[in-house]
Amino acid sequence: MDIQYLMRQAKKLEKAMADAKEKLAEIAVEAESGGGLVKVAMNGKCEITRLTVDPKAIDPNDKALLEDLVTAAVNAAVEKARTAADESMSKATGGIKIPGIAG
């Protein structure tokens, strides 16, 4: 096996992975909870880009409900972002599973 060839292929894979990681910020996912009372937008790096709370969800006497709605929406958005990031990184690596490279 040609070592030079393997080194070139490794460099190509490294560049493809770096490019894909940069593009994670461009991935956009949204999730909601409480029938749309709380909405979260997130990018592929699992950074929240927008959080919307319907005034109907704000009850000073039931703070726990709002906390639960926000938690549920954020967790759903994280799951969607991770899935999208994994798909993006899988394309960059040609389907090779490399632990810890997404996001």
From Swiss-Prot:
InterPro entries: YbaB-like_sf, YbaB/EbfC. One of its GO terms (cellular component) is bacterial nucleoid. Pfam families: YbaB_DNA_bd. The keyword Protein biosynthesis does not apply. One of its GO terms (molecular function) is DNA binding. Its main location: cytoplasm. Keywords: Cytoplasm, DNA-binding. It is found in: Cytoplasm, Nucleoid. Belongs to the YbaB/EbfC family. HAMAP family: DNA_YbaB_EbfC. Homodimer. Binds to DNA and alters its conformation. May be involved in regulation of gene expression, nucleoid organization and DNA protection. This is Nucleoid-associated protein AnaeK_3694. It comes from Anaeromyxobacter sp. (strain K). The lineage of its organism: Bacteria, Pseudomonadati, Myxococcota, Myxococcia, Myxococcales.
